[in-house]
Amino acid sequence: MTIQDLVGTYSISGSNQDESNEITYKGVLTLTLDQNNRIKADWIINSHKQKGTGFFKDNILVINFSYKGDDHKTYKGVAVYRCITKDVLDGFWSEKHGDPLYLGSEYCLRMETTERLN
């Protein structure tokens, strides 16, 4: 798998960085490449935008992200995805000011995929 294979739009579902493992949000993740062939990520979750940049190696995608909270502060974190196929990403994430005892989780499925889920 190459970094170019990951470019596209994904439907996401995830859980927040707390003790609950239940799906707490859904949204869309769009991955593109910049002029240096690095990943640019744009999330839309519950009408909120998040952005990030990242890199890819050995089927692992790492994205440093940030967003403005409702309190107008900028929050930052890192997301790590295992690229199961070019259409399925399974990941976890952590924010700087999140609960350090837990990780958030995120599952991504390419929106135009023909792959079936189990």
Protein language model features and the residues they cover:
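Central antiparallel beta-sheet cores of small beta-barrel/beta-sandwich binding domains
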Residues: 1-118
